[in-house]
Regions:
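Catalytic domains of carbohydrate-active enzymes that cleave complex glycans
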Residues: 262, 282, 287, 291-292, ...
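Acidic/polar loop patches that form or flank catalytic/metal-binding clefts of enzymes
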Residues: 234-238, 407-408, 607-614
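Extracellular and organelle-lumenal recognition/adhesion modules and their flexible linkers in secreted
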Residues: 21-144, 156-157, 170-172, 179, ...
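Catalytic-core region of carbohydrate-active enzymes that cleave or remodel glycosidic bonds
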Residues: 544-644
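Bacterial N-terminal signal peptides
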Residues: 7-16
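Bacterial N-terminal signal peptides that target proteins for export
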Residues: 1-7
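Short, glycine/acidic-rich beta->alpha junctions
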Residues: 63, 144, 157-159, 219, ...
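Aromatic-lined carbohydrate-binding surfaces of glycoside hydrolases
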Residues: 110, 130-132, 142, 151, ...
Length: 761
């Protein structure tokens, strides 16, 4: 009865009490606006009520750490042209952290119409964090949060600092004091947690309306700066600065030297076209000198995968300046067979080739000086809709006057002594010296398609410039190429930062192929770090790389103990699956998810995190050509392909593969050139908090290992905190949704690190 009376009294005297939430702190309230604040591991919804309890803004941070908070305006009437500023942070002794170390961003909202999963909900969610560069408006009765991030300089003195945030609008002003305590330790420039976030440069080019590579390089540099500020690394900082390779001694391009299906000798030349939206062809790599006054005949042996399959042999003509002569294609469409047979094309110097009163081919034009030879396994068309596989052997281009074959290497045999690979690192080195010479990035991805299958019909096997694994030619090229990369990285001090990530989420059926590729890499360049993402981590595949990266939900701590103990690195990744209640990366999820990922990583001894993309803003196959998705209006990540018909879209989840927003809010109509950086998301800012939490934990470990005899009380306290209990998480489905639990432990770690630092002086 007394409880009922108490609740009734509170509702009468304090009607807002019923709706007051249990996070955040009221700063001040008047008829114009309520001001309240919250730490930055909360998503403040538009209609969240102001908290009942009061509290001043107090934050703590190490040197070289970023720490944030949110101030929320909840107007009693609409406010316009609100300006916001912050003063320098000052100690009573006069030490100062200048205001330029504070980023002020507006928390904006995106409308989730399609929830990411069955346990997600539609609604307006906070996510984009654009810088406040001009006054803004605040709607009556709607929360309008402002996000502050303070970067503490490495040279700052420890102790308490004080600053004032000022909001101004016509007829209204509010001053908000802020207290910052700088702890007496410094975070390292390079985070202990490695990371790999994909970044699509072509997407940036499109959405920023950039005209050339120089503009793209300028904008990418701003993205990379933002990455460093967030303590994350892109997978490839050298997207526009590739390692270039040139293979020498190979005379045919586009097909495969097939050792398993031959007419004579060691090889035939297989050309395979498996695509319905592009044409495939084999081509002699050089132009052949011809005399249009002489008769020629092309003769070859061929077979096709299917009986009566049509294939084509074409000859193009060029001037003495090696310019293509249009409308002068020569050649023949042939009917193939599953057994070898001989075909030919005759090119008369005078008379055209006529069939049923139709001119099929005319003599070489009088200005022709060169010709090229093209082998198609089907009949090429404008859309590339045909498919097929054909083999060619003993191909000859004969000058009938002299009887000489003017096409070298038409037998498709290879002199292995001629093979070589030239590597050009000049562009890569420019980027590496820019982005690896300064702290911030923890590593970079190397993709090697030479370990993947090529345009080859047959067994699933690695392919390098026309040669398949198992041939002496492949072995030689692979040895030169991979060892060349290894040695160059080692010579420049970059070895160990790379991870060779060439295959993604292999299925069990692919394990033999994956093992072969990893063995090639280890045999040719044993110092390179091999990497794999694993949807089903297990003993069948875990031993073939130096780093394994399962999806977080599939990580098995018990299974992985032995491999980690042996020194194998373990990372984890988040993606479109699984949805809530698992830890996930979606906009329509609890804010704590991104931070919890790092706490779980520490508990499980994981040393890296990966997300497939950070700016997947559009899937071209899901919309009409030239129409771009506007993620400011629809934050769902769509994906084409996956066995869906053209124009259909798989829904990956809101914000999957998308942690940054383009500055262009109307990509289909706004053609302004944006030479600016990205708009970060609230989720990536919270992830940075987790990365810094992880730094705290590793630094505590280091202090524990190097503790002095008189520091055992500190050691015991540190070990207790680092033994993460079930009040934080049980597994990736059972974890606290209350950020205050993480912040409590962070507070304890910060104080301990300060004490260790003080006693080690």
């Amino acid at each position: 009865m007394n409880k009922i009376w108490l609740w009734s009294f509170l509702l009468i005297i304090f009607p807002g009490f019923l709706f007051a939430q249990d996070f955040g702190y009221l700063i001040k309230s008047d008829d114009v606006c309520e001001l309240w604040w919250a730490e930055n591991t909360y998503k403040i919804m538009k209609d969240d009520p102001a908290p009942f309890k009061k509290g001043k803004i107090t934050i703590q941070a190490a040197r070289n750490e970023s720490e944030g908070f949110q101030i929320v305006l909840l107007p009693g009437k609409s406010l316009e042209n609100i300006s916001v500023s912050v003063s320098d942070f000052k100690q009573k002794s006069g030490n100062t952290i200048e205001a330029r170390n504070v980023a002020i961003r507006k928390v904006e909202y995106v409308n989730v119409v399609k929830p990411s999963g069955i346990f997600h909900k539609a609604g307006w969610y906070p996510d984009p964090l654009p810088l406040i560069e001009k006054p803004f408006n605040a709607e009556k009765g709607v929360n309008s949060p402002v996000w502050f991030t303070v970067k503490v300089p490495k040279g700052a003195s420890s102790g308490k600092y004080y600053a004032t945030v000022v909001f101004k609008s016509a007829g209204w002003q509010a001053s908000v004091p802020v207290e910052l305590e700088v702890w007496n330790f410094t975070l390292p420039d390079n985070p202990y947690m490695r990371s790999a976030f994909g970044l699509y440069s072509d997407m940036i080019r499109q959405y920023h309306n950039l005209s050339n590579d120089e503009e793209l390089k300028q904008v990418l540099d701003k993205y990379y700066t933002c990455f460093k500020e967030l303590r994350i690394s892109p997978q490839k900082f050298y997207d526009l600065y590739p390692i270039r390779k040139k293979v020498k001694g190979v005379w045919w391009d586009g097909g495969t030297f097939d050792p398993d299906t031959v007419f004579s000798g060691r090889y035939s030349y297989q050309v395979s076209d498996n695509s319905t939206n592009g044409n495939a062809e084999g081509q002699f790599s050089d132009l052949i000198s011809i005399d249009p006054s002489r008769p020629y005949i092309l003769k070859w042996w061929a077979k096709t995968l299917k009986k009566n399959q049509q294939y084509a042999v074409m000859v193009l003509c060029y001037t003495s300046e090696k310019k293509l002569i249009p409308w002068q294609m020569k050649g023949m469409i042939c009917s193939g067979n599953i057994s070898w047979h001989e075909d030919s094309v005759y090119i008369d110097p005078v008379n055209p080739l006529i069939f049923q009163d139709m001119v099929l081919s005319r003599p070489f034009p009088h200005n022709a000086a060169f010709a090229s030879v093209h082998l198609n396994p089907d009949v090429p068309d404008r859309h590339g809709s045909q498919t097929g596989t054909a083999w060619f052997d003993n191909f000859r281009f004969i000058d009938l006057k002299s009887g000489k074959n003017i096409l070298p290497r038409g037998d498709f045999e290879q002199n292995i002594e001629d093979l070589d690979v030239e590597l050009d690192f000049s562009a890569f080195d420019l980027a590496a010296k820019q982005y690896l010479a300064t702290p911030g990035f923890t590593g970079f991805r190397i993709q090697v398609p030479e370990l993947r299958p090529g345009p080859y019909y047959g067994k699933r096997v690695a392919w390098f410039n026309g040669f398949i694994n198992g041939t002496a030619e492949y072995d030689k090229l692979a040895d030169i190429y991979f060892k060349g990369i290894q040695d160059h990285l080692e010579a420049n001090g970059w070895l160990g930062k790379e991870y060779v990530y060439w295959i993604d989420e292999p299925k069990h059926d692919d394990y033999t192929f994956v093992r072969e590729g990893m063995d090639i890499l280890h045999r040719t360049a044993p110092k390179l770090t091999r990497f794999i993402t694993e949807n089903n981590p297990g003993p069948e595949i875990m031993d073939v790389t130096e780093i394994g990266c399962p999806v977080l939900a599939k990580f098995d701590p018990e299974k992985s103990k032995e491999w980690i103990a042996r020194g194998r690195g373990m990372w984890s990744y988040l993606m479109t699956w699984p949805k809530a209640p698992h830890v996930n990366l979606f906009i329509d999820s609890d804010a704590i998810n991104m931070r919890m990922w790092l706490w779980m990583s520490y508990k499980y001894h994981l040393t890296g995190i990966l997300v497939w993309s950070s700016n997947c803003w559009n899937a071209e196959g899901c919309s009409p050509h030239g129409v771009f998705q506007n993620i400011w209006e629809d934050p769902m990540t769509y994906m084409d392909g996956n066995g869906l018909p053209d124009g259909a879209a798989a829904e990956y989840g809101n914000g999957d593969g998308m942690f940054f927003y383009p500055p262009n809010r109307d990509p289909n109509n706004d053609k302004t050139k944006y030479l600016t950086g990205p708009v970060p998301s609230l989720r990536i800012e919270i992830l940075r908090e987790g990365i810094e939490d992880y730094d705290y934990m590793i630094m505590l470990e280091h202090f524990v290992r190097s503790a002095r005899p008189g520091q055992q009380n500190l050691v015991r306290a540190a070990e207790k905190i680092l033994d993460i209990k079930q009040d934080v998480f049980v597994n990736d489905q059972e974890y606290t949704k209350d950020p205050r639990i993480l912040m409590k432990y962070r507070q304890q770690m910060g104080k301990l690190l300060s004490e260790f630092s003080n006693k080690n002086l």
